[in-house]
């Protein structure tokens, strides 16, 4: 069973059931045939394929075309045997159950094994296999495609047909070997019969050996004297030998000087010259042996001129033909020289001298090359040529095989022992016609070979043209894709240029408009403020460019990151609409403003209340960045200019603007969210800055507090000391008191510089700082301040300072105590901020703060609660409150 595939759609190791080197079937099974069931897809005529890619392409083209035409697959039976591959339609068992089996009607195709060109399966779909066969009639190739029900079955069919090639090759080799064995057996039987017919042949050779030298010396046409190493040896003429080939015969060293002349007597009744009384004498050269003969001088000139007109006319008059015997009575008995057909004859010009006429022994090469003027005598026999040297190469073979095995020339031969008749012999004209016909057939075959070569060149040219066209189409596709990409890049560049143009124009438009400030609230007193002192520093915000801070090479230097992330520009509005829409908005107005970023960096940047410069993070991390923003020193100098222009006056809390209820979805409610919009936190910053400036103005200007009406003394208890007051007293409820002397202006400037903190803004509101990671820094003010003790005193002892109605005079107060005006404390309490204490007073611990000026020897009497209770009852025996407690 095949192993389940684990390496993808095609695994040759897992799909092959057995090793390819092991035969799949027994060879005897191919004699009967191996049957398979499959579905026949279709066939199509294709050119001769050269590569596997062309074969797979032809297979898939057949599948797709037959599927597009809607031709259904037909179930067939495939039989693979040594005869070939036979495809037969399957019978329908229900309809044709009673009918006889007629295979001729159901036969689809039959191809012998030697006509099958290629067989393979599709690597993508293992159920599909095909084989390409050559049609014998049209000499074309057809691709036949089949589909099996299982992948393993398709592979078994392919391997079965592949094994059939080997089986047929072995069968052909066995048949050839059997044929050679039969021929060898027949030749052996014939040689044994001839040996029994002429037992005295060897004795005659020994007796006639001495006469051979005399005949060679007296005859000019004979070879030089015998001097070969094999002369005079007794050799058997009837021993079978191995057939000679061109290479073996050409390389064999045989001494031609040891070849004598032999006389063969052949009766011929077709010519009146050659009568039985005057038997025909044929000169015969035997290799390395001699036959018994008798020399009889006779002229051959007249005989040869009368018999053949194609032989050379110049003949030496001294040439004689030997005879076998001088007895004329023996000439009537036809004698035939018996020689085995597989006798080797060396030659260099023609590889097969014995195959043209095996009945007549041929001359060796030495006689054909050395003595060209010697006439070679041939009897008048069918299928023979006057001279073997005049034949072209290949015509001496009786069977001619064309390169495509389509033409075979079988030459007829006759035995010498059969009597010749005048009706069965052909004339010289008929022989010439036969020769011309064979030459014509050879020319036709040459033309056919040339045509096949031309067709092959055409196919190669077609495949190369197709490949070049495919390469050109692929190049065209790549060029079109590159063109599309270039167009997209050009569109992006044009869009970026348009955005830069719009941003630059927006910057110029915003810088050309004069900055408009919020209306400053005028106090109720007649003393006006200095016009140089603005209550809002919105125009000093580095996010808003001035006339001199615009740089054309930095178009994004003042663009908020929210607008850049949204991919659009902020809407163009008038300055009045911007002032109206500042702060937290109820509804988003555009896609650019409706951006929400829940980044953690923006969250912890907003947690600190310490106001930092606009680009504090980027300046700390990279101080070499060229950004045109005001530094902290410039901001502090501006604050000092504001302090220098202060004039004394009264201060009061300006009334807040009443916002009209907006008609929106939220109906006036604030839409709080996390966003990169820098306008959302500006209102809080302005309020904080305005309160800080008002604090500074209140501290600088002398105030006249109106006298408060006398308040009723309340009974102060311990419970009431630690309960929050429902109605805290205001400044008007307090008694007027004389303010302590104000400190100098320089000290006040110092305190103001301490209280003023730099405005806070997230790093993501600017493009320059948004590209760098934010830096967490502790919330430390510019100048070290210590508001912790005051805040603690405000929160813990608020009720104590509120419940005391009568405050002691400044003369009675301890000189070490902090002297702070009540109006300053009330304003600080109202705003949640207290100025730092003086440097001469230092409170380190809470215990020291609570138990100050307490006599520890008299703890029950000098404790804080005892003092407060007695003071509330009017008992001032314990003295004033300790230093550090609020009044």
UniProtKB/Swiss-Prot annotation:
Example of a GO cellular component annotation carried by this entry: axon
Chain segments carrying region Disordered: 176-254, 506-606, 641-753, 804-839, 853-887
SUPFAM superfamilies according to UniProt: PH domain-like (SSF50729)
Keywords from the UniProt entry: Coiled coil
Record flagged with keyword Nucleotide-binding: no
Chain coiled-coil ranges: 434-506
Sequence ranges assigned to domain PID in this UniProt record: 30-197
Bias kind Low complexity: ranges: 510-519
Knockout mutant characteristics: Mutants synergistically exhibit progressive myopathy. Overexpression of dyc-1 in dys-1 and hlh-1 double mutants, delays but does not prevent the progression of myopathy due to reduction in the proportion of abnormal muscles. Also, reduces the locomotion and egg laying defects. RNAi-mediated knock-down of isoform b induces a dys-1-like behavioral phenotype consisting of hyperactivity, exagerated head bending and a tendency to hypercontract.
Keyword Coiled coil: yes
Gene3D superfamilies reported in the protein's UniProt record: Pleckstrin-homology domain (PH domain)/Phosphotyrosine-binding domain (PTB)
Compositionally biased intervals (Polar residues): 242-254, 597-606, 816-827, 863-887
Biased composition (Basic and acidic residues): 176-186, 205-216, 573-588
Domain of life of the native organism: Eukaryota
CDD domains in the cross-refs: PTB_CAPON-like
Tissue expression profile of the protein: Expressed in muscles of the head, body wall and vulva. In some animals, weaker expression is observed in the intestinal muscles (at protein level). Isoform a is expressed in lateral neurons SDQL and SDQR.
PROSITE patterns (UniProt xref): PID (PS01179)
GO biological process terms on file: locomotory behavior; muscle cell cellular homeostasis; positive regulation of locomotion; regulation of egg-laying behavior; sarcomere organization
The protein's assembly and partners: Component of the dystrophin glycoprotein complex (DGC). Interacts with zyx-1.
Official protein name in the record: Dystrophin-like protein 1
Source species: Caenorhabditis elegans
Encoding gene (name): dyc-1
């Amino acid at each position: 069973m095949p192993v389940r595939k684990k390496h993808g759609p095609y695994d040759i190791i897992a799909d092959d059931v057995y090793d390819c080197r092991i035969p799949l079937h027994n060879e005897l099974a191919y004699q009967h045939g191996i049957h398979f069931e499959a579905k026949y897809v279709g066939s199509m005529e294709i050119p001769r394929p050269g590569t596997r890619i062309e074969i797979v392409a032809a297979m898939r083209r057949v599948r797709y075309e037959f599927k597009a035409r809607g031709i259904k697959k037909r179930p067939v039976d495939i039989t693979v045997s040594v005869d070939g591959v036979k495809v037969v339609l399957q019978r329908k068992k229900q309809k044709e159950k009673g009918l006889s089996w007629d295979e001729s009607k159901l036969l689809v195709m039959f191809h012998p094994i030697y006509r099958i060109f290629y067989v393979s399966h599709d690597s993508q779909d293992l159920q599909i296999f095909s084989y390409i066969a050559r049609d014998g009639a049209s000499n074309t190739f057809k691709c036949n495609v089949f589909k099996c029900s299982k992948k393993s079955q398709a592979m078994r069919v392919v391997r079965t047909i592949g094994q059939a090639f080997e089986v047929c090759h072995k069968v052909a080799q066995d048949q050839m070997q059997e044929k050679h064995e039969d021929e060898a057996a027949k030749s052996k039987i014939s040689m044994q019969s001839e040996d029994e017919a002429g037992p005295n042949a060897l004795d005659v050779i020994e007796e006639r050996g001495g006469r051979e030298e005399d005949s060679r010396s007296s005859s000019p046409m004979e070879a030089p004297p015998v001097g070969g190493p094999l002369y005079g040896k007794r050799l058997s003429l009837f021993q079978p030998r191995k057939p000679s080939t061109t290479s073996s015969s050409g390389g064999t060293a045989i001494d031609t000087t040891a070849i004598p002349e032999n006389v063969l007597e052949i009766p011929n009744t077709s010519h009146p010259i050659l009568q039985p009384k005057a038997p025909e004498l044929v000169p015969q050269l035997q290799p390395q042996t001699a036959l018994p003969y008798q020399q009889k001088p006779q002229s051959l000139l007249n005989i040869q001129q009368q018999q053949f007109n194609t032989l050379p006319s110049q003949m030496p008059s001294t040439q004689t033909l030997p005879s076998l015997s001088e007895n004329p009575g023996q000439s009537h008995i036809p004698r035939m020289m018996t020689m085995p057909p597989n006798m080797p004859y060396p030659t260099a010009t023609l590889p097969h001298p014995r195959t043209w006429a095996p009945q007549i022994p041929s001359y060796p090469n030495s006689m054909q090359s050395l003595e060209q003027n010697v006439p070679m005598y041939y009897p008048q026999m069918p299928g023979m040529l006057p001279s073997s040297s005049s034949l072209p190469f290949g015509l001496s073979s009786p069977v001619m095989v064309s390169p495509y095995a389509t033409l075979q020339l079988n030459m007829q031969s006759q035995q010498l022992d059969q009597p010749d008749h005048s009706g069965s012999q052909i004339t010289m004209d008929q022989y010439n016609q036969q020769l011309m016909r064979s030459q014509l057939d050879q020319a036709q075959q040459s033309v056919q070979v040339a045509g096949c070569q031309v067709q092959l060149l055409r196919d190669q040219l077609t495949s190369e043209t197709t490949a070049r066209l495919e390469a050109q189409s692929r190049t065209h596709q790549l060029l079109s894709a590159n063109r599309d990409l270039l167009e997209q890049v050009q569109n992006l560049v044009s869009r970026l240029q348009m955005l830069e143009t719009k941003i630059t124009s927006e910057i110029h438009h915003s810088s050309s408009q004069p900055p408009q400030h919020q209306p400053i609230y005028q106090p109720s007193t007649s003393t006006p403020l200095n016009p140089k002192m603005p209550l809002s520093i919105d125009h000093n915000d580095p996010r808003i460019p001035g006339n001199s801070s615009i740089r054309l090479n930095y178009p994004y230097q003042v663009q908020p990151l929210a607008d850049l992330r949204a991919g659009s520009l902020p809407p163009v509005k008038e300055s009045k609409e911007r002032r109206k829409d500042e702060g937290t908005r109820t509804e988003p107005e555009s896609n650019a403003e409706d951006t929400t970023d829940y980044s953690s960096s923006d969250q912890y940047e907003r947690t600190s209340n310490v106001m930092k410069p606009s680009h504090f993070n980027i300046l700390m991390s990279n101080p070499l960045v060229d950004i045109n923003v005001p530094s902290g020193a410039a901001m502090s100098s501006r604050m000092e200019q504001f302090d220098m222009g202060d004039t004394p006056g009264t201060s009061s809390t300006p009334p807040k603007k009443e916002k009209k209820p907006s008609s929106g979805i939220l109906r006036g409610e604030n839409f709080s969210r996390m966003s990169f919009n820098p306008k959302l936190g500006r209102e809080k910053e302005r309020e904080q800055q305005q309160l800080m400036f008002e604090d500074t103005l209140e501290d600088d200007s002398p105030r006249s507090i109106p006298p408060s009406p006398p308040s009723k003394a309340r009974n102060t208890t311990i419970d009431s000391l630690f309960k929050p007051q429902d109605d805290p007293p205001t400044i008007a409820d307090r008694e007027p008191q004389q303010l302590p002397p104000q400190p100098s202006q320089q000290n006040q400037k110092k305190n103001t510089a301490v209280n003023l903190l730099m405005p806070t803004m997230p790093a993501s509101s600017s493009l320059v700082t948004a590209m760098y990671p934010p830096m967490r820094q502790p919330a430390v003010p510019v100048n070290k301040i210590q508001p912790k003790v005051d805040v603690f005193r405000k929160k813990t002892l608020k009720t104590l300072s509120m419940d005391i109605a009568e405050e002691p005079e400044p003369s009675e107060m301890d000189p070490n105590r902090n002297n702070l005006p009540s109006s300053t404390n009330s304003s600080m309490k109202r705003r949640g901020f207290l100025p730092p204490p003086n440097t001469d007073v230092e409170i380190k611990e809470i215990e020291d703060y609570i138990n100050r000026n307490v006599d520890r020897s008299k703890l029950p009497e000098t404790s804080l609660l005892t003092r407060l209770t007695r003071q509330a009852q009017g008992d001032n025996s314990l003295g004033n409150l300790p230093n550090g407690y609020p009044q």
